[in-house]
Amino acid sequence: PEMSRGLGDVYKRQELLREAKRLGFSDFQIARFVLKPEGTNMEKENLAVRARRKELGILPAVKRINTVASEHPELTNYLYMTYAVQGYDVNYYKNEKSVVVLGSGAYRIGSSVEFDWCGVQALQTIRKEGYRSVMINYNPETVSTDYDMCDRLYFDELTFERVMDILE
């Protein structure tokens, strides 16, 4: 209730914007709800919310997916981004060259396995050429999301906001 009443104050109240992000609202949804840009360029409004969020230091944390029920220290490359906690589970190597591959997402008739195979081939070529490979995909059914296919695997949505958060 307070969230819906107060989103108009998003540019004034850092804690409200942080809470909106923690609850899962995208920058696009916040822009549409707060700025109500009927007939305007939503890309511009979306970028305005993104810029304000970054200016306020509201950034997602990168966490590892726990695949072993905390039985021993987690060292997988399965990652996701969240606003629910702070702190990173991984270190970033800014001096190492990385190439990001966008995954196939959900399987669709006529464009599923073939598109995933393209991603796998891209990841193998990236590694062969000596670059760090990063895959962003939310479909665990694909070969490209196997743990040994890439150096970093983000199980996350394929949206402008999420891809940019990972790239930055």
Predicted regions and their residues:
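Single conserved hydrophobic/aromatic residue that forms the stacking wall/gate
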Residues: P1-Y11
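Short flexible coil/turn linkers enriched for glycine and charged/polar residues
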Residues: L23-S26, Y93-N95
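Short, amphipathic alpha-helical "recognition" segments used to contact nucleic acids or chromatin
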Residues: K12-F25
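ATP-binding N-terminal substructure of ATP-dependent carboxylate-amine bond-forming enzymes
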Residues: G39-K44, A51-E55, P60-E168
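Short alpha-helical "recognition helix" segments of helix-turn-helix
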Residues: E19, I30-A31
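Intrinsically disordered or highly flexible coil/loop and linker segments, enriched in small
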Residues: S26-Q29, R132
